[in-house]
Amino acid sequence: MKKTVAVLFGGESKEHEISLQSSISIINAIDKKKYNIILIGVEKNGKIGIRSINNYILFKYNINYIKLAPAVSYLYIIPGKNNYQFYSLKNKKMLKIDVIFSILHGSNGENGAFQGLFNTIYTPFVGSNVLSSSICMDKDISKRILSTFGISVVPSITLYYENYKKKINKIINNIKFPCCIKPSNQGSSFGVNVANDFISLKESIDVAFLYSKKILIEPFIQGREIEVGVLGNRNVISSVCGEIKFKKIFYDYKEKYISKKTKIIIPAKISNEISNKIKKIAKLAFISLECSIMARVDFFLTKNKKIFLNEINTIPGFTKNSIYPKLWSKSGLDFKSLINKLILLTIYKK
């Protein structure tokens, strides 16, 4: 009997549109001979509803206009150990789901919120648990923990919105330029800026606080951006390393999803020694933060060969431009095989 996979996409975060694009690739890749599919769109206001396989996203291939198609039926969630997890309001039917494949990026999707919801309905889901998801989403907390395992991370100053005005003058005196200002719990480079002087620093702080009540100020690292994919539960494997080359001073939202000038080089043109070291650190970070199923780990590699772990993404992108599936493709696991592998890892997770 075929198992039923529910794909969740959309969400309330700033990365709503990226999630929609990722869902297209995943839905196309799921083996329909092996699995039944239920498409669940999460609207920007948080409403959850079933979408038709024939009409689930409008303006699919335009990042500026892409949006969820109207729901076929909104859903109630049924908590507890039940045979059914969702109730359809339109046709009054209960839905049984065996696996949840959530591609909800960012806050209230990648930060443990929905992972906790999945736990309340006792349904296995692709990705890390509540704790790991929450930690990895918070750049400040994840860096503190990774440091205790001897992993080099970019040093940072943490500012909280409620009291930063009392500390800002003292902090500014200790900052060297250029520096990078970023929200602690956002993805896709939302709210991230590089400051070269005190005026741009204060402006960048104000922008970052629009996205989060906690922000980080880091020294700007002049280096190459190297990324590696991690896959597994107890037996963790890593992909080849990839490098992202871009025109701007840093890899911002436009460079990630709009610019056609960004280049992805796989495998990265680095020595075997550096490559193996980065892959080893990626797996150590994945295990140290108790991640599971999948993650993309991002690094900076400086001219003098210093390696800094930048961040861990527990729900990496799956768009046509995303590096995570490309890394695995170059490692011998094509897109459809990768999606099937992720589902099987979830089903047989212990």
From Swiss-Prot:
Single Gene Ontology BP annotation: regulation of cell shape
EC code(s) of this entry: 6.3.2.4
Binding site for ATP: 172-227
Primary location recorded for the protein, binned into one broad class: cytoplasm
Pathway as given in its UniProt record: Cell wall biogenesis; peptidoglycan biosynthesis
Annotated ranges, domain ATP-grasp: 143-344
InterPro entries (UniProt xref): ATP-grasp, ATP_grasp_subdomain_1, D-Ala_lig_Van_CS, D_ala_D_ala, Dala_Dala_lig_C, Dala_Dala_lig_N, PreATP-grasp_dom_sf
Keyword annotations: ATP-binding, Cell shape, Cell wall biogenesis/degradation, Cytoplasm, Ligase, Magnesium, Manganese, Metal-binding, Nucleotide-binding, Peptidoglycan synthesis
Pfam families the record matches: Dala_Dala_lig_C (PF07478), Dala_Dala_lig_N (PF01820)
Catalysed reactions, as listed in the record: 2 D-alanine + ATP = D-alanyl-D-alanine + ADP + phosphate + H(+)
Positions contributing to Mg(2+) 1 binding: 298, 311
Binding site for Mg(2+) 2: 311, 313
Family: Belongs to the D-alanine--D-alanine ligase family.
Described purpose of this protein according to its UniProt entry: Cell wall formation.
PANTHER family according to UniProt: D-ALANINE--D-ALANINE LIGASE (PTHR23132), D-ALANINE--D-ALANINE LIGASE A (PTHR23132:SF25)
Name by which UniProt lists this protein: D-alanine--D-alanine ligase
Source organism (scientific name): Wigglesworthia glossinidia brevipalpis
Gene: ddl
